[in-house]
């Protein structure tokens, strides 16, 4: 599974599972899982609300990472195959 591979990679890199990259990775997995669920169950409004909350959390973490370390941010979005944040 991708999660186990990423966890082992993160453990080699640093012992902290609370890193921004790891949190974004977990949120991305949850988002993908909820998206596939909502394709089948379109009227599941509680899941839609949960998806919006997780999207907001991931967006805030990515904004923080892009401000603090642009190189790590670019590597992460390429690794997870997600789009770059829109800037205002």
Curated annotation (Swiss-Prot):
GO terms for molecular function: structural constituent of ribosome. SUPFAM superfamilies: S15/NS1 RNA-binding domain. Keywords: Chloroplast, Plastid, Ribonucleoprotein, Ribosomal protein. Gene3D superfamilies: S15/NS1, RNA-binding (1.10.287.10). Disulfide bonds: none annotated. Part of the 30S ribosomal subunit. Belongs to the universal ribosomal protein uS15 family. This is Small ribosomal subunit protein uS15c. The gene is rps15.
